[in-house]
Amino acid sequence: MSNRTEQQIRQHWTPAHAPLLSILCPAYNQKAYIAQTLDSFLAQQTSFAFEILVNDDASTDGTAAIIADYAQRYPNIIRPILHAENQYQQGKLFFPDLFNRAQGKYLAYCDGDDYWTDPLKLQKQVDFLEANPDYVITYHDALITDEKGSHGVQLTGEWQRDANRMELLRGRRISTLTTCFRNVLHELPRELEQAPLLDVCWWSMLGAHGKGKYMPEIAPGAYRVHNGGLFSMRAGKQKLHMSLQTYACLANYYQRQGDQPLYEYYLVQVFGLSLSAISPLQKLNALLLVARNVSANLFKRLTLSASRG
């Protein structure tokens, strides 16, 4: 458990009626990791008030008890949400409730098995967003970590740069645990309720509000890979299916919004992923079927997508 007292954490905070930033942390059966995660939050050195919302989805391994212990020690910082029954198994999403509970102008997100390493991370991100209203989200690098240590950066190359609004609208890849963004997402469109990769949907919706800033000056966070990880340990076909379903949800959403370019973009992604696991003959038959039902321009884009798959 962190050596910092609540008084030490709050000593430089500007008096305020509400926290400027809310840290959102969903947790489930992460007893071995949750303490390190919470300690990395409590290590943050800021001039502003922040709160920590930890949502435990009825863990069975003692995770909830650890969260409750931390909340008792830091009652003015940690707000635990401890469910007696598993909400996920009932088809209920954590996102709407957790986001609506957040009091902050800004949100930072980190799962209960990941953690941060830079004690000035939040201060740097909030300072940037306060000074740059045309940006809606900030992010930085994360290292892939397991019991043997770190194994390189999670997202490299083309992802280590700023993102324009269109890239965000198109669900640009961002390391979720590194993000700090404006609290402008209050309702989840009905089409996105069944999307397995909710963070991709968040980035797309945030694109309607501004740009993304990559901040390499922030020390990398830790993206933990382990057998209990909800996404990191999924098989390739499972990840493909999750991406396909997410893009299909986004296509339906933008179709209802009347945004034809984004609807077609996500439709192309769905088509390409769908074709990636089938035979050449099946691809040809699918293309012939689609050719009879879409515009020439869209068919050309679908064909290019098929050739890449």
Where are these regions (language model features)?
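N-proximal low-complexity "stem/linker" segments adjacent to membrane-targeting elements
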Residues: 1-43
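Cell-envelope/extracellular polymer assembly enzymes that use nucleotide-activated donors
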Residues: 19-22, 51, 201
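Short aromatic/hydrophobic "clamp" motif used to bind/position activated sugar donors
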Residues: 107
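Conserved donor NDP-sugar-binding/catalytic core segment of glycosyltransferases
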Residues: 120-153
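Glycine-rich, basic loop-to-helix element that forms the pyrophosphate-binding segment
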Residues: 83-102, 124
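A conserved acidic beta->alpha catalytic loop
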Residues: 56-65, 85
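Conserved nucleotide-sugar donor-binding catalytic segment
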Residues: 100, 140, 156-238, 242-246
